[in-house]
Amino acid sequence: MGEMVERVDEQDHTLGVVDRGEAIRRRWLHRVATTVCRDPDGRILVHRRPDHVSRFPGQYNWLVGGAVGVGETYPAAASRELAEELGVHAPTRFLFKYLCRGVISPYWLGLHEAVLNEPVVPDPSEVAWHAWLTPVELRVAMHDMTFVPDARDAFDRYQAEKAGSRGSLPRHSALPPRPERSP
């Protein structure tokens, strides 16, 4: 058996425990916890998935995360994923969750935020490349590079949440050299 998750309904109530692969194949709702990682200057961590992974190989993402395990909360899963994927232990702040219809399967997405004050040490089996981008640079990158399918919708929701809770994020005009895909 693979990774076990809780199958949930349209209100995010648990219906039972299933294999995540089966939940995806049958398009059953389950939970995913993600974190937007920011540095003290407000830049956002962007990473490229390795070419060998089964879902979205070689594509970029601005969120770190994964499935919420059986009996696990969204925040606990977000913290676990930060440690597994980036080798960091940082407090996460739950921002919101929403029902994401998803390209490969629908799921409840819990979005968190963390400010990382320590260097990241990505697991190469999870992260092939990473860089810190301003929100404006990230928006440009989403148009120029191939991001995981649900990234843009999540980013739009995140930006709306940030604008609604604290006003607009600072705008920066300088863009770094465009990250290149490895061959």
Map each language-model feature to its residues.
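Acidic, metal-coordinating catalytic segment for phosphate/diphosphate chemistry
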Residues: M1-T34, P40
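Glycine-rich adenosyl-nucleotide cofactor-binding module
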Residues: Q59, L63-V64, V70, P75, ...
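Nudix hydrolase/Nudix homology domain
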Residues: D19-G21, G58-Y60, V70, F96-L99, ...
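A glycine-rich, hydrophobic loop/mini-helix early in the fold
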Residues: V32-W62, G66
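Active-site segment of metal-dependent pyrophosphate-handling enzymes
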Residues: R27, R31, D51, T73-P75, ...
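Residues immediately flanking
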Residues: E10, R49, P135
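Short, well-ordered strand-loop elements centered on a beta-strand within folded domains, enriched
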Residues: T14-V17, G42-R48, P119-D123
